[in-house]
Amino acid sequence: MAEAAPQDAQQNFAIQRIFLKDVSFEAPNSPVMFQKEWNPDVKLDLDTQSRELGEGVYEIVLRLTVTVKNEEETAFLCEVQQGGIFTAEKMEAGQLAHCLGAFCPNILFPYARETISSLVVKGTFPQLNLAPVNFDALFMNYLQQQAQQGEAEA
């Protein structure tokens, strides 16, 4: 009979907390913007940051900045920093990097998207539904860029 792996060798992942770290909404050209025909140009910038809070405990912050222009004028600017505290223990380095750089942001994104949508509606603009983001693909692109930079420096 095969022995089970020791309990302390098992990987552990858990969500400890999801929280709103920072939020900003600006509509610099209101109320004039409400009188114009609505043909928005939406720009989304996103970034993630991670830091270790303790052994196996990490804070991940997903920052989304949405800038919407209408007829070349800024209709609104919305920035949300959605944070999470996660336990990620007993993972190899590559797996931990993927967890912190892609898996955790995937968990945080729906919360940030909902906050942005709510702020936009409260600003009395048409609802903004952000498309899903493929954080796995973004993380893979990041790894490829890091590898190319390493080759260029060598």
From Swiss-Prot:
UniProt cross-references to Pfam families, sorted A to Z: SecB (PF02556)
Domain of life: Bacteria
GO CC terms: cytoplasm
Any one Gene Ontology molecular-function term assigned to this protein's record: unfolded protein binding
InterPro entries: SecB, SecB-like_sf
A GO biological process held by the record: protein folding
Keyword Cytoplasm found: yes
Location of this chain's protein in the cell: Cytoplasm
UniProt keyword annotations, A-Z: Chaperone, Cytoplasm, Protein transport, Translocation, Transport
Gene3D superfamilies: SecB-like
Quaternary context: Homotetramer, a dimer of dimers. One homotetramer interacts with 1 SecA dimer.
Function: One of the proteins required for the normal export of preproteins out of the cell cytoplasm. It is a molecular chaperone that binds to a subset of precursor proteins, maintaining them in a translocation-competent state. It also specifically binds to its receptor SecA.
Family: Belongs to the SecB family.
Designated name of the protein: Protein-export protein SecB
Organism from which the protein derives: Vibrio campbellii (strain ATCC BAA-1116)
